[in-house]
């Protein structure tokens, strides 16, 4: 039996293994099937992760018999490593459910904009350190 203090990190880590392997092999499959000219795998993975995250979190919150460890294993571990996009959309939707529409919109657009800028910064830093 796992120590109570290790249950949370164990659940997240165990779920992450399956999520990351699923993402990896599905990405390969889509690239082999449709070619590398468009990131179909990433698109399908991100969208399917959002559907599954929405379904799972709705069901998990309505059913107390689903333990916190199972929520963490699947919601944070599996889906978090399958796609972080689903978590991003869940956070946005949560803000909107709280009627914090402006905050949700700023978060949603800001994540896209600042994510692109952060990517550009990372590229710039990598080029500077060559």
Swiss-Prot record:
The chain crosses the membrane at residues 10-30, 41-61, 72-89, 105-125. It is a multi-pass membrane protein. Keywords: Cell inner membrane, Cell membrane, Ion channel, Ion transport, Membrane, Metal-binding, Sodium, Transmembrane, Transmembrane helix, Transport. GO terms for molecular function: fluoride channel activity; metal ion binding. It catalyses: fluoride(in) = fluoride(out). It is found in: Cell inner membrane. Na(+) is not transported, but it plays an essential structural role and its presence is essential for fluoride channel function. Na(+) binds at residues 80, 83. One of its GO terms (biological process) is cellular detoxification of fluoride. InterPro entries: FluC. GO terms for cellular component: plasma membrane. Fluoride-specific ion channel. Important for reducing fluoride concentration in the cell, thus reducing its toxicity. PANTHER family: FLUORIDE EXPORT PROTEIN 1-RELATED. Belongs to the fluoride channel Fluc/FEX (TC 1.A.43) family. NCBIfam families: crcB. HAMAP family: FluC (MF_00454). This is Fluoride-specific ion channel FluC. The gene is fluC.
